[in-house]
């Protein structure tokens, strides 16, 4: 895919600035299609498609969790691991305000506000991951090691979907 065939988002600018190699994938976005939609379109395992989930704690402070597409986050376990009382999903408006991205197009790269990033630890064992590139219908493929540029903290909070 040539450079002219995919969007240049804040995430792409971030990846380029860090000299991170990535493979762009553009697909037909479908409202509420989630990671399963991309996995189906690209013929990739949904387990390797990583969700970027924006959450907030009891103090209304934002955080991001990167999770396998075929798993859910145990917010109870996450709160325990982080020493917090309560964690819940951020509203779509709040997530957009913090990240600069629309829900369905949220990337952990190039966020408007630097939020703490937490990575489900089993993601590191994958050979390749597919994560949102900062726009609905746009995914970037890369090695999981590239997530280290986000200075993430490992967590173990995945539960079966």
State where each predicted segment sits:
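Extended, low-hydrophobicity, polar/charged segments
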Residues: 1-161
